[in-house]
Amino acid sequence: MICVGIESTAEKLGVGVVTDDGEILVNVKAQYIPPPGSGILPREAAEHHSRELPELLERALKNAGVEPEDIDLVAYSQGPGLGPCLRVGATAARTLALTLEVPLAPVNHCVAHVEIGKLAARQDGFDFDEPVTLYVSGGNTQVLALKAGRYRVFGETLDLPVGNMLDTFARKVGLPHPGGPEIERLAEEGEPVELPYTVRGTDVSFSGLLTAALRRYEQGDRLEDVCAGLQETAFAMLVEITERAAAQLGRDEILLTGGVAANRRLSEMMHEMAEDRGAEAYTVPPELAGDNGAMIAWTGILVHEHGLSIPPDEIPEKAIVKQRYRVDEAPVPWAARPSRSADSQG
């Protein structure tokens, strides 16, 4: 089976082509860059996606060596995300599936980040079936684990997602978008300043940290030192709540996924924690960390194999988007099952 997945929840646009044994044939991306000093403008991002998607889809199929008639399934990111952006991907996916007369698989974006991480872990030799997952991105900061047939939230941010916090700081101090990689680069050259640390059980709060970091910069601290302090403090908070959730659940597998998982320092801190407590940790590869079409395609295959895809004749009325689609609302009947054939892929 070959699935084409379309990702369009926010500023990133992606098309992935994946087989049902977990082979990623292609994973192409485009990104909307907001105006300097501005955050993501949803309608402008959607216009960018509308312009770029036809060429991106054509390039994906060409690079994968796949003809339209080879496609067995189409998947799209149903939510959560920005409404205008989600609708671009959903409309394209509906049109493609109807044209090809193949099923359409709606995918929860957060679940897809977990599933692509589990796939990559298994392909790298980690037998991860039910890890505690730290999912960190521009729009989400959650500690997730499988319980009672769903991915449940065992910890999360009480205000800003960590990626949004980093991007906001970067924008306020004049760094280009996306801000996370710029902060990571500067932090390597700095000595961490002391900043407030806010953990409540297995939840975190980043608004006070952001305000304090901006104040230190405005008061004359070196940007490199503030970036180092911001990273160390935020990431220590995230590692603490992940460790606490793993201890409460009695789990010894830890998965780090989402766009912020590409940060080397966060990955290093998470792996150090896991080693200290005798657990195994795995960080999703950088090319699969941020939003991408391959994760949608792979999860779409899981959705379809478990009877949750939409038949062609039902697509017009059932292929919708859900801007506030919580991860614990999404059924994941495959998640607790033994590893599939993809486990043996190297």
UniProtKB/Swiss-Prot annotation:
Organism: Methanopyrus kandleri (strain AV19 / DSM 6324 / JCM 9639 / NBRC 100938)
Entry-linked NCBIfam families: arch_KAE1, gcp_kae1, PRK09605.1
Listed EC numbers: 2.3.1.234
Cofactor requirements of the protein: Fe(2+)
Record's cofactor remark: Binds 1 Fe(2+) ion per subunit.
Domain of life: Archaea
Family matches, as Pfam families: TsaD (PF00814)
Role noted for this protein: Required for the formation of a threonylcarbamoyl group on adenosine at position 37 (t(6)A37) in tRNAs that read codons beginning with adenine. Is a component of the KEOPS complex that is probably involved in the transfer of the threonylcarbamoyl moiety of threonylcarbamoyl-AMP (TC-AMP) to the N6 group of A37. Kae1 likely plays a direct catalytic role in this reaction, but requires other protein(s) of the complex to fulfill this activity.
GO CC field: cytoplasm; EKC/KEOPS complex
Gene: kae1
GO molecular function: iron ion binding; N(6)-L-threonylcarbamoyladenine synthase activity
Protein's UniProt name: tRNA N6-adenosine threonylcarbamoyltransferase
Annotated compartments: Cytoplasm
